[in-house]
Amino acid sequence: MGTWLDVLYLWNTERKMKKTTEFEPVTMDRQLGRTLLVLLLCRIGNGACPYKCQCFTELQVLCADERMSTLPRVSTQVREVIIMTSSLAYLFSHSLMESPQLTKLIFLNNALRSIHLSSFEHLTELQELEISGNPLLDHLYLGTFSKQEKLTKLLLNYNSLKTILPGLFDPLTQLEVLQMKSNVLSDLPPFLFRNLSSLRVLDLSQNRIQEVTGETFSGLASLEILKLGNNLIVNLTSDTFRNTSQLTELHLEWNGIAQLDDGVFSALANLSVLNLRGNRLTAFTDKVFGGEPTNLQELNLKGNRLTELSLESLSSLTDLTLSNNQLSSLTENLFRNLTYLESLDLSDNQLTSLPEGIFKDLLSIEAINLHNNTLTELDSKLFQDQILLKRLYLSDNQLEMLRLGLFDHFILRPTVRLHGNPWRCECQLWYLHDWLMQNLQHVELSDLVACERPDSLRKRTLVSISRDQLVCHRIPEPNSCSLQMSNGTVVVRCSVEKCSPLTVKVQFQEENEAPALSDIPSSSLNVFASKPLTASLGGLD
């Protein structure tokens, strides 16, 4: 809002701080006070500041009075006027007639209901205009901006605009920024922006727009940022963005998009940021860009219903968000060619395991988020190529132990989250325990890394127990035997854990004869005898 408002803000902040620090020197407070005094003297000397307004410079006027219902008269020297939180309800044809010199005019959080189509007729020098925060303003007349050929910035946010008439923006050939965020627009006339060849930023987010086509964005040859988030868009075609080839950012979050056709973004060769968060996508493939390599750097697919992915041609990606989907498995080559990727978010999915080489091409990765999946184990070589990793989140999974060497590949010591897993605090956890004790300062919420088993250590934090308490109680494997027959020879192999002496009883039976039992003493357990008989294993003690 200008340097004089910055001074006012700093002075007010400083005063509040002084009240809480009784013994703090007041040198800075006095200096700011002197500065304000000089500015106020300038204001008094000017003598032209409207009643209940602030004029800290001769060029700027700020009026914020809830009782103000008409526009104040300002000096011909004033270039910027800001009207805030007033009761101003109407702008008439003569309201601004005496201020043709204005270059900046802002109406913020007022009670505007209607603006006469000639209200701005005399403001031919206007470069920036904002009319925002007027919940009763639901329309603009055709011709409202007919004389604003020099306007570069128009903000119409947080009103109740229901529709925009065709031709309303036609005179604004120098416009660079147009915002109509948080209105109730449901339909955009074709060719609405046809004369806005200089427009770089268009914000239509938080409306009720259901459809956008190639004709919607006709004429926007210079558009770089397009925001369509929080609307009701369900369908996009390859024709939709054919007139916006210079786009670098496209925001489509929180719509109802369930499917993206191949080539839908093929015209957007310069796109670096694509936000599709909170839609209904079940699959996403790089074919949406026509299968060609792209310059895309940030892709946000959080909060969809994804079960299938293909990202091979997105080799320029640096930030990939896949959290809060329905991914249960990933192919080993999913991230192939993503050598520039720095941040990968796979949290809040249904992953139970990860292929050993899934991250092998992620040589630049700095952050991997696997929080809140159902991972039960991780291969010891899973992160062997991620030597630059700075953050690794493994919290809230189903991990009971970590394999030896899992964290040994990192050059840096990454910040790690391990809490929320059912750690089995036995000898298999020696590696994690030792690593944790040596890197405690790099483990976030380490006091929540707790044992689930055995019962004697349940809910004990891993940092509170010693290595000697991580004991394995050996459980004998079930008795097992195998039988092989080759060329009339029967071989029986048994693995039995019992104390000596041990006698094995084997029952042999020849054809048409009664079974015969043979005893094999423990001293002969590793000796195999063969007989040219038809044999069956009759009993084993």
Q: What are the language-model segments listed below?
A:
Residues G2-W4, L8-E14, K18-D541:
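Extracellular leucine-rich repeat
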